[in-house]
């Protein structure tokens, strides 16, 4: 697993948590 991909997924999850 690439760190960049993991970081991107973590950022997406964070944005979803902020929206909801």
From Swiss-Prot:
Cofactor needs: heme
GO molecular function: metal ion binding; oxidoreductase activity, acting on paired donors, with incorporation or reduction of molecular oxygen, reduced flavin or flavoprotein as one donor, and incorporation of one atom of oxygen
One cellular component (GO) term of this entry: endoplasmic reticulum membrane
Membrane topology: Peripheral membrane protein
Main location: endoplasmic reticulum
Subcellular location: Endoplasmic reticulum membrane; Microsome membrane
Keywords attached to this entry: Endoplasmic reticulum, Heme, Iron, Membrane, Metal-binding, Microsome, Monooxygenase, Oxidoreductase
Function description: Cytochromes P450 are a group of heme-thiolate monooxygenases. In liver microsomes, this enzyme is involved in an NADPH-dependent electron transport pathway. This isozyme is active upon P.nitroanisole, aniline, D-benzphetamine, delta(9)-tetrahydrocannabinol (THC) and strychnine.
Protein name as annotated: Cytochrome P450IIB
The species this protein was found in: Cavia porcellus
